[in-house]
Each structure stands twice: as C-alpha cells, then as structure tokens.
Amino acid sequence: NTQTTYPVLYMYDGQNVFHSREAYSGHSWKVIPHLKWNSQIPDMMIVAIDHDGEQRLNEYTPWEMNPAEIEKTQQVGGLGKAHASWIVECVKPFIDQHYRTSPQKETSFLAGSSLGGLMTAYTGATYPDVFGVLGIFSLASWVNDEAFLHYIAQHPLATQTKVYLQVGTMEGNETDQGFTSKNVNQMYLDSSLWY
C-alpha cells in the first residue's frame, strides 16, 4: 500500500542493530528477525544511528564523565547534547520528509542500551514533544549520575510518554571496568533504579 505511513524506531548504536558482522560488540540485536517472529509488533521503520567508533564515549554522554568514576586523566564526554540535537533537528526531519512515516510523537520511538540508553533518556527529557516511546536498556547514567539526575528532575517527561526500562544482573564489560574499580553491575542497577 503506497498510502500507508509507518511508526519509526530510532536506535542508538546502529552498528549493533541488524547484523553481527557489523556490530562493534560482536553480536547484534537482530532486530529484523525479532520483528518478523513477533506478529504483535506493528510494521515500522527502523533507523539505526551509528556512532563514530572511538568517539562513542564523547558522542553518547551529554556531560563530561564524573571524575570520581574515571581512573584516567583525560576529559571524556560532553558531546551528547549536540548529538541529540542533530537527531531531532536533522535526522528525524530528513526521515519524515523522504519516507512514509507517521511523524507524530506517539509513533516516534527512541531506544538504546548502555550509553545509548543514557542518550535515549536524555533526548526524551530534552525533547518531550518529539518521541512518545522510549526504550532504555542497561542505563549507563553512572558516568555522571549527579548531572543526569539533576537534569531529569528539571526536565520531566510528558505524562503520555511511555518508557520501557530494562536492566540485567550481568551488566558491564571490560570497557566499563576500564573507567572504574567499582562494581559495574551494581552501578547499572542503581542507574536504572534512580531513573
């Protein structure tokens, strides 16, 4: 049907969305098979937003990482605000203009895991009239909990916004451990609970 319009799911860490051979983590979310196997999920478009490899920590953190959490001396993070703005002001309008989307808030979804989850939470709070559904997996707000919690308190979500929040009990990896000596699994759990 050439008149049909579709909801759109925008996903952070686009390299991980479709194929494992492209995934920076070595395995993908395999979104297409999951959509095919679950007939309850409506047809939709998926926009997989890649990060810039080595710049992921900078792109996916709205604030500099908390020095108390970093055992390194370099400045890390702080470009997430510009990245969120780029998605809302450039990517989404381009997709809505060139494809048959349902551009309304209720049919515009945003999801991500770890730092992608942080960016999903941040973007949802910053632009409450743009995305109506947020999928936040393994929220990594621990990179600067103080700034995150203060920001979220000052920028509440719209009451109609739907949030799916998920965290496991085996979170984190060697990359996370490179930034802190704390229990990374507990840090992810706390981030999700405090949100």
Model-derived features: where do they sit?
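Non-catalytic cap/lid and distal C-terminal segments of serine-dependent acyl enzymes
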Residues: 1-195
